Amino acid sequence: LFSYGGIRFATALCGDLWTPGKPEELAALGADAVLWPVWCDYPAAEWNEQVKLEYAAQASRCGCPVLYVNPFCVDPAAPDAAAGGAACFSGGRIVCEAPAGESGILFVEL
């Protein structure tokens, strides 16, 4: 747990939120938000159409907004290339997002 700008953050790495009990453990910390850097190699279309909804549902178990960020590989033909994307998940919803398959910056106000 750390604070920045008066906001208390917890951090989850990649598959942490899929580990049984980990989302609830993070919720018990009482953070204002969870930072969730990942490496997801789903094809961009698959992420944008369906998978992000599963991640939003899983993130809701943390009990606070979850800030998801996935790196953007410039060579999409590379094996296991990450397609980028970022989102703010809260309450099982996608509050805002930068779609996978595009480079960009997502600004989120907490």
Describe the role of every protein-language-model region.
Residues 7-16, 35:
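Active-site-proximal beta-strand elements of phosphoester/diester hydrolases
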Residues 1-4:
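Short acidic-hydrophobic surface loop/beta-edge motif
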Residues 18-105:
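CN hydrolase (nitrilase-like) catalytic-core segments centered on the catalytic cysteine
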